[in-house]
Amino acid sequence: MAGLAAVMLVLAYFLAKWQTKRLVRPIYELDLEHPLENKTYEELTPFLEAMDRQNKEKEAVSNMRKEFSANVSHELKTPLTSISGYAEIMKNGMVRPEDITLFSERIYKEARRLITLVEDIIKLSKLDEESVELEKQDVDLYELTREIISRLAPQAAQKNIRMEVTGEPVNYFGIRQILDEMIYNVCENAVKYNVENGRVSVWVGNTLDGPKVTVSDTGIGIPQEHHERIFERFYRVDKSHSKERGGTGLGLSIVKHGALLH
């Protein structure tokens, strides 16, 4: 009797092992790269759908990184090529004395463009990593905006653009440096993409939803079809005139990340 029980126990063990392998085999054979293409147990569908979403998110992040790297390489190469070209011509003595100042100005502008681009990339990297170590404090948005408008006055004067700030003093608990970057970038865009003899109006005040800064201008505007992409890095609505306006294509990305940080 004891021998029969032992035999039955051994048979039960091997039967359970065989049955388990049969049940688990479809799971082992899953294509984890394309989980929804697998034909398996219905109970696994929610798990496979979640895995598919994660795979798509990872792929999107990977594509964004590749695109960002390609854009950075292109944006860095363009001014460096110009600087190298102008410098080589001057080095070889191929510039007339009366053109030296012109070439020097072009080299300076390209160098400033390069510096601005690197600074913007560093700012975005810090915001991405949330490594901004500055403490939050009460910031008077009205006074901050007046300072920013004052800094932009020379740039606005080149196109005879009138800038004005209206509203009232309003405190906001945030990181002053980031708030400065956000408001500055929006106001600078309002100047860059404005028309001659145009106007930029900024309103600062309290609303039912809290403190608010509104910027309006008489500029060329942004076509509706571009609205969803204007916060993407290096995205420009008018690529043909981006260089002459001096933008890096990162300003609104900094605004977006600054807003998310707050």
Residue ranges of model-derived segments:
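Membrane-proximal HAMP signal-relay module
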Residues: M1-S69, S84-K91, R96, E105, ...
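Short alpha-helical segment of the dimerization/phosphotransfer core of two-component systems
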Residues: K109-L114
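Conserved micro-motifs of the catalytic ATP-binding
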Residues: E129-L134, G167, N171-Q177
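A conserved beta-strand-to-alpha-helix junction within the catalytic ATP-binding
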Residues: E135-S150, M163
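Short conserved segments within the C-terminal catalytic ATPase subdomain
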Residues: Q155-V165
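Short helix-loop "hinge" at the ATP-lid/N-box region of the Bergerat-fold HATPase_c
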Residues: A190-V191
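Short beta-strand/loop element within the Bergerat-fold HATPase_c
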Residues: N197-D209
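Acidic ATP/Mg2+-coordinating residue in the GHKL
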Residues: D217
